Amino acid sequence: MADADAQRQAEEDANLQLPPYPHPPPFYLKFTTENKDRLDEIKKEDGIDTASDGGKSAQLSTEQILALPTELRYLIPPEPPADTEEFNVFGTINQLKDRDTFNGTMEYISQALAKLLPDWKYEQLYPTTDASNSASSTLDRQRYLFRFLRSILVAYIELLGIVAINPTDELKDDKLKDILTMVTNMHALINEYRPHQARETLISEMERQVEKKKMEIQGVRKMKERVGEVLEGFGREIPSEKAEDRTEEAAVTSEEERKRDAQRQMWQAMDEMLSQ
C-alpha cells in the first residue's frame, strides 16, 4: 500500500507543471470596486474626507485600521520606511536614504592609520560645487587635479629629503599627512566624474548598437539583391512557348534538369548569404 502511494505521489510530482513566473500574492483579489467603496464609506463615517486626501488612508489611526474587516485592511498601504531604516542587500547593510560613503571611507582610513598618522583628518582643499551656480562658474576639476598632482610630487621629493637626513624626524609624518590629504582630494574629484563616465558609457553603447543595426540592415540589403539576382536568373531560364517542336520526352528531361540547376543555384545562394 505504501509503495502504491509513493508511486502515485511520484506520478503526480512528474505531472506537476510549474508556472514560468510566480503567482501574484493572493490578497490582490481583495482590491475590488466594492471593497474600495466600503472603505470610503467607513472613512466618511469616521470623518475622513477621501476627496481632500486623494483617497489616501494615512489618516486612519492604528485602532481604526485594526477595527476594519480583514479584506479591507489590504487596501491600506503600509507606512513608508524611515530614511534611517537599514536593510541587507547581498550582505551589505544599506539605508533608504543614501549614506555619505565618501566621508565614511575617510573615517575608516583615519581609524586604520591612527597609529601611523595620528590626528589625521580629511580636509577638502577645493571649493564645493553648487548646483545653482551657472555654467561659467562650474568647478574646473581638471585644473585642481593637476594642482594636486604637482603638489604631491613636490611633497614626495621633500619627504625623501627629510628621510635622507633624519628618518625619525617628525616632519616626515607631517609630509605624509599632506600627501594623504591631497591623494584623498584627488580621489574625491575623480568620483565626481562618475556621472559623466556613466553618461559617456551609455552614449558609446548606444552608438555601438546603432552601428550594429546599420551593419545588419546593410547585410539584409545585400541578401535582398542576391536573392533578386537569383530569381531574375530563374526567370530567364523559363522555357518559351517556341519550344513546342520538341518532343515530350525531351521537354520533360530538360525541365527536370532546369529544376535541379535551379535548386543547386538556390542552395548555393543560401550558403553564400548565411556565410556572410
From Swiss-Prot:
Belongs to the Mediator complex subunit 7 family. Component of the Mediator complex. The keyword Transcription applies. It comes from the Eukaryota. The lineage of its organism: Eukaryota, Fungi, Dikarya, Ascomycota, Pezizomycotina. This is Mediator of RNA polymerase II transcription subunit 7. Transmembrane segments: none annotated. The keyword Transcription applies. GO terms for biological process: regulation of transcription by RNA polymerase II. Component of the Mediator complex, a coactivator involved in the regulated transcription of nearly all RNA polymerase II-dependent genes. Mediator functions as a bridge to convey information from gene-specific regulatory proteins to the basal RNA polymerase II transcription machinery. Mediator is recruited to promoters by direct interactions with regulatory proteins and serves as a scaffold for the assembly of a functional preinitiation complex with RNA polymerase II and the general transcription factors. Residues 1-11, 234-263 have a biased composition (Basic and acidic residues). GO terms for cellular component: core mediator complex; mediator complex. Residues 1-27, 234-276 are annotated as: Disordered. It is found in: Nucleus. GO terms for molecular function: transcription coregulator activity. Keywords: Activator, Nucleus, Transcription, Transcription regulation. It holds the Pfam family Med7.
